[in-house]
Swiss-Prot record:
The lineage of its organism: Bacteria, Pseudomonadati, Pseudomonadota, Alphaproteobacteria, Hyphomicrobiales. GO terms for cellular component: cytosol. The gene is purC. Keywords: ATP-binding, Ligase, Nucleotide-binding, Purine biosynthesis. One of its GO terms (biological process) is cobalamin biosynthetic process. Its EC number is 6.3.2.6. Belongs to the SAICAR synthetase family. Signal peptide: none annotated. It comes from Bartonella quintana (strain Toulouse). InterPro entries: SAICAR_synt/ADE2_N, SAICAR_synt_PurC, SAICAR_synth, SAICAR_synthetase, SAICAR_synthetase_CS. It catalyses: 5-amino-1-(5-phospho-D-ribosyl)imidazole-4-carboxylate + L-aspartate + ATP = (2S)-2-[5-amino-1-(5-phospho-beta-D-ribosyl)imidazole-4-carboxamido]succinate + ADP + phosphate + 2 H(+). This is Phosphoribosylaminoimidazole-succinocarboxamide synthase. GO terms for molecular function: ATP binding; phosphoribosylaminoimidazolesuccinocarboxamide synthase activity.
Amino acid sequence: MNRRHRIYEGKAKILYEGPEPGTYIQFFKDDATAFNAKKHEVIDGKGVLNNRISEHIFSHLGRLGIPTHFIKRINMREQLIKAVEIIPLEVVVRNVAAGSLSKRLGLEEGTVLSQSIIEFYYKNDSLDDPMVTEEHITAFGWAVPQEIEDIMQLSIRINDFLSGLFAAANIQLIDFKMEFGRLWEDEAMRIVLADEISPDSARLWDMQTREKMDKDRFRRNMGGLINAYQEVAKRLGIINENEPPRPSGPVLVK
């Protein structure tokens, strides 16, 4: 069996050299991490569900004309994606107070915000991903003003779509994290959505019960993470009500 060239390994995914120039294979791991990997556990089946959910969301966004790195899902754990130059920022869109926003500003968790808030965090685990301003971003050369504007506009469009998508599934989108990258095509460059959107990167609550259906179940030692992710997938129509879980999926050749 052929050994693949590993490009990068993060906390939840591995990037491998793709079959064609300008492509990667993105492999979804079962690792669950929190607090910049200070808390870590392997949860069988998490990567499979995140792959399916992220594929579903990115496919919808692509049909809406929102540029992404996604090409297609290859199998239960892998996607074929376009190679992009990742901008070292986490972009967080908040619709409801929760998590660090509640702690930072003393807001009761669950408080609906009068308008959606977009925040930027510098991707650096050793610094615990500090929040930064647009001035920091341009001063340190992480992105230029036009790129920031593109990211802001895309974030608003993505939030509008996802809020409706999840609401139709009786799920409230509390907040979510995104990453963006530069995609070079011939001499032209454009900003595209990268990474993933899944219950790992979004806070999702049941609209009636306010039950958490995301990685907070791991962060807060609530248990039931796989069941929650499966429920999200079922409500989005990704898996059938009676479809048995297939946790492990193919074994990756390293």
